[in-house]
């Protein structure tokens, strides 16, 4: 979820995290005795939990500490899905632990951030869509987030029977948590760093609202007349209203999302029996084996569980996409055909539209209009006053005025309101494609409009303006959100990321009453539903589609579900999205087509190991994923083709030293459509690129039959930084299976 480039959801989203492999160079004389939490990974899931926990204690005791101290230092033993533990160690102790024969890897625990109605109709999943309700009721979706609001209407269990027999999870009792029902069938929290700030509650209850919003988006029941103070009124619902939810609270509003808690959440979800995991969390770029979400999702994949994750909110900068593992379905954020704007009426008769949600009707026809610079306390404060920073403004010059402020941080309207101002016009070129909620009359305009307003102020001694209450506006869509993180994939030049785009702008969904709408001091706005934007909001849309597909095909692998979603996507116009597939992957989700894709590109865990070997991984770096140091790439049959992966998309990265590049991609598809089918290849090649497919026709005589083919791509050298788009479509009379082909020339090798 996002608020602004600077505030990032104010108190919650400023938290960042990176996993560091422990090495002697990271320790210094100053921190040698300082202790921090580390995750010590020992390998695959053990057979005997009790003996494994004893082993964890004994390993800690070997650091010349007592058994009692070892028990105090250990905060987690992971024994249900993999073998690991988390404990408080000094850098020297962590180094010694890494040298132990039993230990596969050691990583420092740090923190990640959250990537934070009409959208389902927009993507083609209306209430009338075909459903297998009996199977849908058996689908269990695990959400790793900030908790959930069990009293929300979105989580009523009317008409739902008891949880599926396969469910092994639990639900409290917990403090300040009313409990689960047949909709929310599981709820747990994870917090063992000893840091519980004031206002937090040790329970799965959501005091931030993020987890409630994402959970209701993926599987909320129908709630009629849902709105935000009358805005975006309609029926709120999730993709699969009959599916079950399990909440794993791994993020805390004031202290973030810890590695060790995220791993504990994954372990619990795997053990409990979820089938889809939705996680709208991310952090700085890391390699595939040193990232807690990567490791947790790999183990989930091995158990047949698909992890759907947000791509991140660091766009439009290139190479910023996170959660870019091939076994994760990585989601970009797109816009739907509505937005929210407020009209600004100037005293000279001119009017402009500002972006944002301001639910306040003006009490006067107009107010004096003043720039932040003109309201400065003194000359020395004028630079800071242009941003309307509180300490730089003269209260008397602000009171009763509409202020014009440059964007310099979040909560500008809070400052203006506290000074008695009548409103704020915020000038910014950041994220003007999504509507920020304001706690006072306010709206955002781009710098071009801002300059016109500044000129008006300077042209008269009696400038005036009024900000009207927000209204809903219809706009062209879909388009990729400016904030949505872009490729190319920083983890691999051979793998296209993100995978897919889904609505993530101005999404109405359930919220908590334990937090105001903005989270800013002085905000008195509370609502059971709110409008949020971010790849955090896009992620549960795709998780919901994955659950929808799962309800039709309970036996499909994570890779098959992922393939179905990517190859059935609706194309997004490259003309309005210059980053092309690096912005939206396969395109916009198309739920009903995803349930009947015709062909799928399937894979198992060995396929991903082959890919990693092709990426240069070795026994040591593979160990956190596969659970042992004994897996050697030299003993594994190499993956076929240029990318060693049976992926539903193709990416070729050119080398600047060559005048042309030729690559052969090997693929295999499985027939999941009519038993007797014939598919013919259609290729679209961009200028300067040759694409051939062999064979050009695939014939199937039965269901689940597999057919292999190769795609040969030959591309001339291009301008550094350029991306061109090709396409392979396998067509039958009933199905069209789309695979984007991306050719990219990096800015440097």
Curated annotation (Swiss-Prot):
Glycans are attached at residues 176, 225, 233, 446, 458, 618. Residues 1-28 form the signal peptide. CDD domains: PA_subtilisin_like, Peptidases_S8_3. InterPro entries: Peptidase_S8/S53_dom (IPR000209), Peptidase_S8/S53_dom_sf (IPR036852), Peptidase_S8_Ser-AS (IPR023828), Peptidase_S8_subtilisin-rel (IPR015500), Peptidases_S8_3 (IPR034197), S8pro/Inhibitor_I9 (IPR010259), S8pro/Inhibitor_I9_sf (IPR037045), SBT (IPR045051). Residues 119-595 form the Peptidase S8 domain. Its EC number is 3.4.21.-. GO terms for molecular function: serine-type endopeptidase activity. Keywords: Autocatalytic cleavage, Glycoprotein, Hydrolase, Protease, Serine protease, Signal, Zymogen. Residues 29-115 form a propeptide. The C-terminal propeptide is autocleaved. The active site is at 145 (charge relay system), 210 (charge relay system), 536 (charge relay system). Expressed only in roots, particularly in xylem. Pfam families: fn3_6 (PF17766), Inhibitor_I9 (PF05922), Peptidase_S8 (PF00082). Residues 38-115 form the Inhibitor I9 domain. Coiled coil: none annotated. Belongs to the peptidase S8 family. This is Subtilisin-like protease SBT4.14. The gene is SBT4.14.
């Amino acid at each position: 979820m996002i608020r602004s480039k600077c505030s990032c959801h104010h108190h919650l989203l400023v938290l960042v995290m990176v996993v560091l492999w422990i090495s002697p160079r990271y320790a210094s004389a100053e921190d040698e005795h300082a202790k921090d939490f580390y995750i010590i990974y020992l390998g695959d899931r053990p057979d005997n939990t009790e003996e494994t926990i004893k082993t964890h204690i004994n390993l800690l005791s070997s650091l010349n500490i007592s058994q009692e101290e070892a028990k105090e230092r250990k905060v987690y033993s992971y024994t249900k899905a993999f073998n690991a533990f988390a404990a408080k160690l000094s850098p020297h102790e962590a180094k010694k632990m890494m040298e132990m024969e039993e230990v596969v890897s050691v990583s420092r625990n740090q923190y990640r951030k959250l990537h934070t109605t009409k959208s389902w109709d927009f993507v083609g999943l209306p209430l009338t869509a075909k459903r297998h309700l009996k199977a849908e009721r058996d689908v269990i979706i695990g959400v790793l987030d900030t908790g959930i609001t069990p009293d929300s209407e979105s989580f009523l269990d009317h008409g739902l029977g008891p949880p599926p027999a396969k469910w092994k999870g639990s639900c409290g009792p917990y403090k300040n948590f009313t409990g689960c029902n047949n909709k929310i069938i599981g709820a747990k929290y994870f917090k063992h760093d000893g840091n519980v700030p004031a206002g937090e509650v040790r329970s799965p209850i959501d005091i931030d609202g993020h987890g409630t919003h994402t959970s209701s988006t993926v599987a909320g029941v129908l709630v009629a007349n849902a709105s935000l103070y009358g805005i975006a009124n309609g029926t709120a619902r999730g993709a699969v209203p009959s599916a079950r939810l399990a909440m794993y609270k791994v993020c805390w509003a004031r202290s973030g999302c810890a590695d060790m808690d995220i791993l504990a959440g994954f372990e619990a979800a795997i053990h409990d029996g979820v089938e889809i995991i939705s996680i709208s969390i991310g952090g700085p770029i890391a390699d595939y084996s040193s990232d807690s979400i990567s490791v947790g999702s790999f183990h989930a994949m091995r158990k047949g569980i698909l992890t759907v994750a947000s791509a991140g909110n660091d766009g439009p900068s290139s190479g910023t996409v996170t959660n870019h593992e091939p076994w994760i379905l990585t989601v970009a954020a797109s816009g739907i055909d509505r937005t929210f704007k407020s009209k600004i009426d100037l005293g000279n008769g001119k009017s402009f539209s500002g972006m944002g949600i301001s639910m306040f009707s003006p009490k006067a026809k107009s107010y004096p209009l003043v720039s932040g610079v003109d309201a400065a306390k003194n000359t020395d404060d004028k630079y800071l006053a242009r941003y309307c920073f509180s300490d730089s403004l003269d209260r008397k010059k602000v009171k009763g005025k509409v202020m014009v402020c440059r964007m310099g941080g979040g909560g500008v309207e809070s400052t203006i309101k506290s000074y008695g101002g009548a409103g704020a016009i915020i000038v910014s070129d950041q994220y003007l494609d999504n509507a920020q909620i304001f706690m006072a009359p306010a709206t955002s305009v781009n710098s071009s409009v801002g300059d016109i307003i500044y000129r008006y102020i300077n042209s008269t001694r009696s400038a005036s303006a009024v900000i009207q209450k927000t209204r809903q506006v219809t706009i062209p869509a879909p388009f990729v959100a400016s904030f949505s993180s872009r490729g190319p994939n920083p983890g691999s030049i051979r793998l296209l990321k993100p995978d897919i785009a889904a609505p993530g702008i101005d999404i109405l969904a359930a919220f908590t009453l334990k937090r105001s709408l903005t989270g800013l001091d002085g905000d008195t706005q509370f609502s059971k539903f709110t409008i949020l934007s971010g790849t955090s909001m896009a992620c549960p849309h795709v998780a919901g589609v994955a659950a929808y597909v799962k309800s039709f095909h309970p036996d499909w692998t994570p890779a098959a579900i992922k393939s179905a979603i990517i190859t059935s996507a609706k194309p997004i116009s490259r003309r309005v999205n210059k980053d092309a597939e690096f912005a939206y992957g396969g395109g916009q989700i198309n739920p009903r087509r995803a349930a009947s894709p015709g062909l799928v590109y399937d894979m198992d865990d060995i396929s991903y190991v082959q890919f990693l070997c092709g990426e240069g991984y070795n026994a040591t770096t593979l160990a956190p994923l596969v659970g042992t140091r004994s897996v050697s790439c030299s003993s594994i049959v190499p993956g076929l083709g240029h990318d060693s992966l049976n992926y539903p998309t193709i990416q070729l990265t050119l080398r600047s030293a060559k005048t042309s590049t030729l690559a052969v991609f090997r693929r295999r598809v499985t027939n999941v459509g009519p038993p007797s089918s014939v598919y013919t290849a259609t290729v679209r090649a961009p200028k300067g690129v040759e694409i051939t497919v062999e064979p050009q026709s695939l014939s199937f005589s039965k269901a689940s039959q597999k057919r292999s083919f190769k795609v040969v791509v030959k591309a001339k050298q291009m301008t550094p930084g350029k991306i061109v788009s090709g396409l392979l479509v396998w067509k039958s009379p009933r199905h069209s299976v789309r695979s984007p082909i991306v050719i990219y020339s990096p800015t440097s090798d």
